[in-house]
Amino acid sequence: GMDQSASLRCRAGHALELDCRTGGVEQVPFDLAGAGLALLVIDTRAEHSLVDGQYGARRAACERAARLLGVELLADVPPGELDAHLGRLAGCGQAGAEELVRRTRHVVTEIDRTRRLVALLEDDRPLAGAKLEEVGALMSASHDSLRDDYECTCPELDVAVEAARAAGAHGARMTGGGFGGSAIALVDTGEADAVARAVVRAYAEAGFAAPAFLNALPSGPAGRLA
């Protein structure tokens, strides 16, 4: 799974690209420290609970959409053919068709965003300027899709992401399974505290409990300390 792979198969200064179909991984250059950047992890302190079946409901919707489209997985839908496939779902005449459209649009565009991000990180340009803007924009677009099409965020996650962006984060998004948990913001190292303070203020204004923070860098796998 994703969490296990991130814990055991990662490499310092790299992001881990995981193919969930095959279990294969690729190490992608992601030297944040060398670029003067950090990932600010924002623990929303919102209860991370999927017990009401929402996670399972989304998986079921994706599997149903794949069956209707005649593909094994929604990952098999080419991004260039997405609109045509969404039109088929919208016109299928079945209950919940609009939900299937949203879920499918998220899955296909999220895979495309991931591939575009990997291609960006693998090119030879420094992680700065236009390249950094593109990376941040892809992160933010991912959150917007998770919020609007996959509908797995929560108010605490959305406030954290919006506040981080407004305070100067290059990009921000929820991470993990959603419905609570944490968000991440790509920030200049020297601006991490200012972004964190902005999130704390936004939480206070919204009446949420104060969040917690961690400045993270891509690191090696878990191992024995002694």
Across the structure, where does each feature detected by a protein language model lie?
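Short beta-strand->loop micro-motif that forms the acidic, two-metal-ion catalytic signature
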Residues: G180-L186
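C-terminal nucleotide
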Residues: A12-G171, L186-A226
